[in-house]
């Protein structure tokens, strides 16, 4: 069987979960640290209405900046997120079948669910969870979402997060992300991951670690915090959540620049968590929950 390219992995997962009944959404157009931060997860996992979606989410973690020199750690990467609410009884079986669709022979490889309960301090979110290992390498995170914004979820959602780069490294048998086959073409049309993303990786690493203006970031954090609170008061939880995401990203940039102390870091986490909570509470209020 021909090894899937990076984009074929995405298309295969989209088709698989579409056939199951998920709506295929688009990435959220904001700086987020993981697919979980998409409002399709944070807000829609709350309340009593069923919700089944899947989407790719480009994600940023400034603290993982390596100037494009690390074989598998980047400040920008891609996740494929699946939310099944309520979580079906056979969710693990569904996940394993998705791996088979990607060409992974479950009988020939060691697939393990390693207990790893998940939490996001800035989102005030938590759930029972497992890392999924394939021959000793983590390729996915599996979580039963129980709390978001400090609010208990009425219906427990099953969240599956595929680490697309790690999955592609495994499927293609390659050691470095930049060498991944992006489009499955040959000759002049062939593209590697590095040709698509690694100049941006180099430049944004320099920005994240060297050029991000700390005073400006501090101002932007405070402005985002205040704007979020004003929008919640105005019954606009969706734009308010955008500013919560902005505040979270500015906090991550400040952290990557080494500007904030350990004590200050805890304070910033609480501030972002408060913003997430008031957005979630207002969303539920306006949804009639």
UniProtKB/Swiss-Prot annotation:
Query: Could you tell me which PROSITE patterns the record lists for this protein?
Result: AA_TRNA_LIGASE_II_GLYAB
Where is the protein situated, by its record's location annotation? Cytoplasm
One GO CC annotation: cytosol
Q: Does the keyword Nucleotide-binding apply?
A: yes
Q: Which Pfam families does UniProt cross-reference here? A: tRNA-synt_2e
Carries keyword Ribonucleoprotein?
Answer: no
From the Swiss-Prot or TrEMBL record, what is one GO molecular function term? glycine-tRNA ligase activity
Keywords from the named record: Aminoacyl-tRNA synthetase, ATP-binding, Cytoplasm, Ligase, Nucleotide-binding, Protein biosynthesis
Write down the InterPro entries for this protein, in alphabetical order. Answer: aa-tRNA-synth_II/BPL/LPL, Gly-tRNA-synth_heterodimer, Gly-tRNA_ligase_asu
Share an example GO biological-process annotation for this protein. glycyl-tRNA aminoacylation
EC class name: ligase
Q: What is its EC number?
A: 6.1.1.14
Give the catalytic activity: tRNA(Gly) + glycine + ATP = glycyl-tRNA(Gly) + AMP + diphosphate
Q: Which domain of life is it from?
A: Bacteria
Q: How does it assemble?
A: Tetramer of two alpha and two beta subunits.
The family note in this entry says: Belongs to the class-II aminoacyl-tRNA synthetase family.
Output this protein's name: Glycine--tRNA ligase alpha subunit
Which species is the source of this protein? Answer: Rickettsia bellii (strain OSU 85-389)
Q: What is the lineage of its organism?
A: Bacteria, Pseudomonadati, Pseudomonadota, Alphaproteobacteria, Rickettsiales
């Amino acid at each position: 069987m021909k090894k899937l390219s990076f984009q074929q992995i995405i298309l295969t997962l989209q088709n698989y979960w579409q056939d199951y009944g998920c709506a295929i959404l688009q990435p959220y157009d904001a700086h987020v640290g993981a697919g979980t931060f998409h409002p399709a997860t944070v807000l829609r996992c709350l309340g009593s209405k069923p919700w089944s979606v899947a989407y790719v989410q480009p994600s940023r973690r400034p603290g993982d900046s390596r100037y494009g020199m690390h074989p598998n750690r980047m400040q920008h990467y891609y996740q494929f997120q699946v939310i099944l609410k309520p979580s079906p009884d056979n969710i693990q079986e569904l996940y394993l079948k998705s791996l088979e669709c990607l060409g992974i022979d479950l009988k020939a490889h060691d697939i393990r669910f390693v207990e790893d309960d998940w939490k996001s301090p800035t989102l005030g979110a938590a759930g029972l969870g497992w890392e999924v290992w394939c021959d000793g390498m983590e390729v996915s995170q599996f979580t039963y979402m129980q709390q978001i914004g400090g609010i208990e979820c009425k219906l427990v959602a099953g969240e599956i997060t595929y680490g697309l780069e790690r999955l592609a490294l495994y499927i293609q048998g390659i050691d470095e992300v930049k060498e991944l086959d992006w489009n499955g073409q040959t000759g002049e049309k062939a593209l590697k991951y590095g040709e698509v993303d690694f100049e941006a990786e180099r430049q944004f690493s320099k920005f994240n670690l060297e050029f991000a203006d700390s005073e400006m970031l501090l101002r932007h954090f405070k402005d985002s915090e205040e704007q979020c609170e004003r929008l919640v008061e105005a019954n606009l939880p969706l734009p308010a959540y955008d500013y919560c995401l902005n505040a979270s990203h500015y906090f991550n940039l400040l952290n990557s620049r080494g500007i904030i102390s350990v004590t200050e870091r805890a304070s910033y986490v609480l501030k972002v968590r408060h913003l997430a909570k008031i957005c979630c509470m207002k969303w539920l209020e306006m949804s009639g929950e």
